[in-house]
Amino acid sequence: QDYCAQEGQQEVQRKDLSDLERYLRQSRQR
């Protein structure tokens, strides 16, 4: 169960990172 929870957290972190990168790229273009 802990392993599944860790995997889920990692996936969420990856999604947050991709969103953050997208946001940074947009702000850089301005």
UniProtKB/Swiss-Prot annotation:
Membrane-crossing segments per the record: none
GO function term, MF aspect, one: nutrient reservoir activity
Highest taxon, organism lineage: Eukaryota
Tissues where the protein occurs: Extracted from castor bean.
Family: Belongs to the 2S seed storage albumins family.
Oligomeric form and interacting partners: The mature protein is a heterodimer of a small and a large chain linked by 2 disulfide bonds.
Keyword set includes Disulfide bond: yes
Keywords: Disulfide bond, Seed storage protein, Storage protein
Main function: This is a 2S seed storage protein. Inhibits spore germination in R.solani and F.oxysporum. Exhibits anti-trypsin activity.
Protein's name in the database: 2S seed storage-like protein
